[in-house]
Amino acid sequence: GGAVGADLAAADGALASGDGAPVVEILPVGLWLAPVRPSVCQLTVCAPGADFTTGQAMERNALIYAASTHTVVVRPRFRVGGTWTGAVDALRRRLGTLLVAGPPSDRAVATLVALGGVPLASVADMPAALMVEAPRPQPSLFGGSAVREPVLAFG
């Protein structure tokens, strides 16, 4: 994701794994405002000097879901904020597999799982969760290709 918190920790963990796999961050700000991370490919849809805005963060979240086979959602709040909105939108449009981290008793976690997310109670569950395939998009009634809505721009 490229934002502070869980996004930054995930990128740092991927770098620390030492397997040489590329690490990509999709930033919610312009490249001029992001700290330079030489081992990371940083992408943004923002102008180079653009500050953080909620709309740009929402657009960035939609791109992350659309580009990923699996996405981990951490600490969703029930019906509040960009994490919730992006997760529900990704589930509705079947954009990859959504892994939902948190206690099953949490209302937001339970709801996202009920909507099709995969529960991720602990890090130990990650290998099994990554084996879960995303639901296939519904075939079109008129041409054989899959129905897939465009990624929405929130900015």
State where each predicted segment sits.
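Glycine-biased, small-residue-rich flexible motifs in mid-sequence functional cores and linkers
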Residues: G1-G155
